[in-house]
């Protein structure tokens, strides 16, 4: 095993809290350790808030350990109260099952379930929680924990004033039971999670100690914060998903390329597999010439390639460059769809007049014919990146990209899409 591995995790800032660090380091240095992270299905896709823990599993696997990705098919039906301000809405079994299947597919893009030496393991806690009777749960799990112990957890304390249901109160015991089951079936000794999971993780370690008389370990990663105070993982209020159908590779790339200067080096350490020496070199270049955004470009390249593949990364760069230069005609219809997903779109009807001035008004790009004429004459209207100043101009087949789209720009930055 790589004895420097744990030190590198710390150097990257990936270790927030750890139980018995010395004993854990010894274990990691001496043998291949089985470890797990749980992913509760709360939607049909994982998002970039899950990326740090997923990549932690990958880091451990690359260093000879065996990662277990636990899909919370059972716990996902209840909802973890950890540092949530309100009770979660409950999802149906069919919904959670469908979400669990989607998540399984996504995880296999990051960790190797076929590796010859240390293949990753995929588990679903519905397999045991779905069969667990209330009597068995109270007898085998509940008896090991006092109410005082459970109430002492910070995640529970924060909800006492506003109210917490017994269902969510008992969540930490279900997560503790997961750790016990994974120890019994797989020999798993280490649980990883975000810093909000510390209370749940230590409950699992306590259950292992009481039921099996073994020492389990817990390690948490830091809560990801952004220098500007906004929530990590959201762009304009929307989650950034790992599923290309929900967040296009172009949007994904844009999220990373727009990283704040104050966050970018930290994110290179968190989210890429560049060595610390490589990151230090990028940091030097970035510090010397921040306007070139070398660090943001490296971050966006590494993470987009990791999640969506090299072809999607190159496509995202092509779209970005075309939008910056105005060379819209170099884009395919698929690239137009990605790059202009969020701009106002008008579906051109068969009866619509195809004169430029008329279409500008019909599509509500312009409020009136007078304003449309004025903007055309003044050179403020662009069709697929080309300025059009002819008041009698009509849109022709050559203005339709692959027969599907025409991109209109008004002024410097206002984009609109005509769809055929």
Curated annotation (Swiss-Prot):
Catalysis: reaction(s): tRNA(Tyr) + L-tyrosine + ATP = L-tyrosyl-tRNA(Tyr) + AMP + diphosphate + H(+)
Binding site for ATP: 234
Key words of the record: Aminoacyl-tRNA synthetase, ATP-binding, Cytoplasm, Ligase, Nucleotide-binding, Protein biosynthesis, RNA-binding
Main location: cytoplasm
Broad class of enzyme this protein falls into: ligase
Residue window of motif 'KMSKS' region: 231-235
Domain S4 RNA-binding, first and last residues per copy: 354-420
GO biological process: tyrosyl-tRNA aminoacylation
Record-listed E.C. numbers: 6.1.1.1
Gene3D superfamilies to which the protein is assigned, alphabetical: HUPs (3.40.50.620), RNA-binding S4 domain (3.10.290.10), Tyrosyl-Transfer RNA Synthetase (1.10.240.10)
Binding site for L-tyrosine: 36, 171, 175
Localization, UniProt: Cytoplasm
MF term (GO), any: tyrosine-tRNA ligase activity
Subunit structure of this chain's protein: Homodimer.
The protein's name in its UniProt record: Tyrosine--tRNA ligase 2
């Amino acid at each position: 095993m790589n004895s420097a591995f744990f030190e590198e995790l710390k150097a990257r800032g990936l270790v927030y809290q750890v139980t018995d660090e010395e004993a854990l380091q010894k274990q990691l240095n001496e043998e291949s350790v089985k470890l797990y992270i749980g992913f509760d299905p709360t939607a049909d896709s994982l998002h970039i808030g899950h990326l740090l823990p997923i990549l932690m599993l990958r880091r451990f696997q690359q260093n000879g350990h065996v990662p277990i990705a636990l899909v919370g098919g059972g716990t996902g039906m209840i909802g973890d109260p950890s540092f949530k301000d309100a009770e979660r809405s409950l999802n149906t079994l069919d919904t959670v099952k469908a979400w669990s299947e989607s998540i399984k597919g996504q995880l296999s893009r990051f960790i190797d379930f076929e590796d010859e030496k240390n293949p990753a393991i995929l588990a679903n806690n519905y397999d045991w929680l779905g069969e667990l009777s209330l009597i068995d749960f109270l007898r085998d799990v509940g008896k090991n924990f006092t109410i005082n112990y459970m109430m002492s957890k910070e995640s529970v304390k924060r909800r006492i004033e506003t109210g917490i249901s017994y269902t969510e109160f008992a969540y930490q015991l279900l997560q503790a039971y997961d750790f016990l089951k994974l120890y019994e079936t797989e020999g798993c000794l280490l649980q990883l999670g975000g810093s909000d999971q510390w209370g749940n993780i230590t409950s699992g370690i306590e259950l292992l100690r009481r039921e099996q008389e073994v020492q389990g370990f817990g390690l948490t990663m830091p809560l990801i914060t952004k220098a500007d105070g906004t929530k990590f993982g959201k762009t304009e209020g929307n989650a950034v998903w790992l599923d290309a159908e929900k967040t296009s590779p172009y949007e994904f790339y844009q999220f990373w390329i727009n990283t704040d200067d104050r966050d970018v080096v930290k994110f290179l350490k968190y989210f890429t597999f560049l060595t610390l020496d490589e990151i230090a070199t990028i940091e030097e270049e970035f510090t010397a010439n921040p306007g070139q955004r070398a660090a943001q470009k490296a971050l966006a390249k590494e993470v987009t390639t990791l999640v969506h593949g090299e072809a999607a990364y190159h496509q995202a760069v092509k779209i970005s460059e075309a939008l910056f230069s105005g060379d819209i005609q170099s884009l395919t219809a698929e690239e137009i769809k990605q790059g202009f997903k969020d701009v106002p779109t008008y579906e051109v009807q068969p009866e619509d007049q195809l004169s430029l001035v008329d279409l500008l008004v019909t599509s509500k790009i312009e409020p009136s014919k007078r304003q449309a004429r004025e903007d055309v004459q003044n050179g403020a209207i662009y069709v697929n990146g080309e300025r059009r100043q002819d008041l009698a101009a009509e849109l022709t087949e050559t203005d339709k990209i692959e027969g599907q789209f025409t991109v209109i720009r008004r002024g410097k930055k206002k984009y609109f899409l005509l769809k055929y």
